[in-house]
A protein has these predicted regions:
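Cell-envelope and extracellular/periplasmic
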Residues: 1-283
């Protein structure tokens, strides 16, 4: 309300720990309850806030997450009669959680939804604190609410852009660039180009295992020795590798059930890079 001068009302229809199946447009009890609330209150809604998915981090549901979320979005819009915006959040973490691959699939699906479904936005949450093994602290929820308000203000009211950085290109750093930015060590560096970087990346640790990135090729995992960022080249990150990587590989970022606690973030928004899983790269 402070940003627009207009009061903001929320219609609460969520339930903690609910899987996507309960939002199934055909017979999901939570979906039907949401429709009841919509019809009871009437009026036109500005958007849907969506933070869900932990209960779908199992084999089967994880693989179908994007498909089922798309069905939910399309059914909701059909019911309302207009393309209501969706403001979504990638999953945070579960301390000592299992099914790493499934967490990676769901986070990746949440990123793809924002890319593939018109009117869907996404925020990253992997640097927010927890009060137990899986739930955000009260402070983290306040911070998340402020981030959502900024993104809603951008989408709905044309305010300043507020999006997490997003990886758009991976290539080998050439000799001139390695020399210019003093990328020494093994001499094997990847250059990552990102969109939506306000100023530059804040990298809390230069150690590769703390970077949040995982790289694999046909020979297995490629150890990441170090990560670098710099102000002169604000929308880039550099990864130093322990060995040469094949021309075709897969890169993942903050994908496990309990990934790194302090991934690289935008220095202005403090939003981590958008998580992704097994992104195919050709060098």
């Amino acid at each position: 309300g402070k940003m627009t001068g207009m009061p903001v009302g929320l219609i609460q229809t969520s339930l903690g720990g609910s899987p996507m199946e309960r939002w199934n447009p055909k017979d999901g009890d939570l979906y039907l309850n949401m429709l009841d609330k919509i019809h009871q209150t009437g009026g036109k809604y500005a958007g849907v806030l969506w933070y869900q998915g932990c209960s779908d981090t199992n084999p089967g549901p994880a693989e179908k997450y994007l498909e089922h979320f798309r069905e939910y979005v399309e059914a909701t819009r059909k019911e309302l009669g207009y393309e209501i915006p969706f403001f979504t959040m990638q999953l945070n973490r579960q301390i000592n959680g299992i099914n790493d691959e499934c967490w990676g699939m769901v986070r990746d699906a949440q990123a793809r939804a924002a890319k593939e479904i018109p009117g869907v936005s996404v925020l990253t949450t992997s640097n927010l604190s927890l009060c137990d093994g899986i739930h955000n602290t009260a402070q983290a929820n306040v911070a998340l609410g402020e981030k959502l308000a900024k993104q809603c203000a951008h989408v709905l009211n044309g305010k300043e852009e507020y999006q997490p950085p997003e990886l758009v290109k991976v290539e080998r750093a050439d000799e001139a660039e390695r020399k210019s930015f003093q990328l020494e060590g093994s001499g094997i560096w990847l250059k990552l180009t990102c969109d939506h970087v306000k100023n530059c990346f804040l990298v809390y640790s230069a150690v590769g295992k703390d970077s949040g990135f995982t790289l694999t090729d046909s020979e297995g995992e490629v150890e990441i020795l170090h990560i670098r960022g710099n102000r002169e080249n604000k929308n880039h990150l550099y990864l130093e590798l322990a060995r040469e990587v094949e021309d075709e590989a897969e890169l993942s970022f903050v994908w496990q059930a309990d990934p790194v606690k302090q991934p690289p973030v935008d220095e202005v928004t403090f939003l981590p890079l958008l998580s992704f899983y097994k992104k195919s790269i050709k060098l």
